[in-house]
Amino acid sequence: MLQILYAGGLFTGFVVALFYVRNLQEFLQDFATLYFKYRNFSATMLLIALPAAAYFAAHDRRHFLSVAFLYFMLLMTGSRSGLIFGTAMLLLCLAYVYYCNPERRAFYRRVGLISLIPAVALLIALVPRLFASRMVDGALISPDDSRYTFFIQGLLDFVKNPLFGCGLGSMHNAPIFLGVEGSIVWYHNLIAQILGSMGLVGVVGYGWLFYDRVRLLWRKRSRTTMAFALSYFAMLLISMTNPGMFCPMPNALLMVAMFVVVERQPDTAAVPVKVGSASTPERRLF
């Protein structure tokens, strides 16, 4: 499953790269990211793939190139969610690699200290130029952003219909949401989506789902399942500003498939221990 997430992320990254190759002249005019319809979906796929790439980087340092590629393509999508959550996930993934390699930690600390200031300086110099097309009055996030309106509307819908919400098929929010034909009304926020469209029933259902998944990850905890946990966390993050986990295909399906794989992992207490090691369990890919 980690290979699937990894391959999907690389494929998405190459799709984004191909888009810029085909529109290179327009990009070179001011070096600002260009709009394309599937940028938020691309950001979602790249974000959940970062932990998978980090898992392989923990075993083979050549995969750090993929981690860098996925993060750079996240920036090139022009998604503000990709920028904010992608940077957070990159740091978590690097911390994961650090944790998985006790014998290399001294080396990683030296590299981190040497590269920290140049990396931050590069990001500060690069982001305003790349995201110039997304700026409103010099701010990356405007107080008038429609996501604020969606979130408030979700709370209002919950107050009006606290038990079941307004329903997934309700179109009464159409004036503030211009979705594609056949789509439900998205609130672009996980909390607002559950409260506004499903009410307390949705809170109980999704609350139990979250509890069950976290409990499963804890019971099966290992370096492999930690990578799955990071991918799940990435999906939860992107769901705070995009449809994310509420899209049945492929987002929700990927999460279901991922937890099927996690469920087939051995329980922590049952993981065999390597000969000559009293505390380090053997880590398997599947």
Language-model segments: residues:
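Membrane-interface junctions at the ends of membrane-embedded or membrane-associated helices
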Residues: M1, F56-F64, Y96-R105, R219-R221, ...
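Alpha-helical transmembrane segments of multi-pass inner-membrane proteins
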Residues: M1-F27, F36-Y99, V204, W208, ...
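Aromatic-anchored segments of alpha-helical transmembrane domains
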Residues: L10-V15, L70-M76, P118-I124, Y232-T241
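Flexible juxtamembrane loops connecting transmembrane helices in multi-pass membrane enzymes
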Residues: D30-F31, R104-Y108, V120-Q153, N173-I176
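Membrane-interface micro-motifs in multi-pass membrane enzymes
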Residues: T33-L46, Y187, L195-G199, G244-P250
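Hydrophobic transmembrane alpha-helices and their immediate junctions
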Residues: R62, Y99, M198-L236
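Long extracytoplasmic/lumenal interhelical loops at the membrane interface
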Residues: V136-M198
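Transmembrane alpha-helices of multi-pass inner-membrane enzymes
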Residues: A227-M240, G244-F286
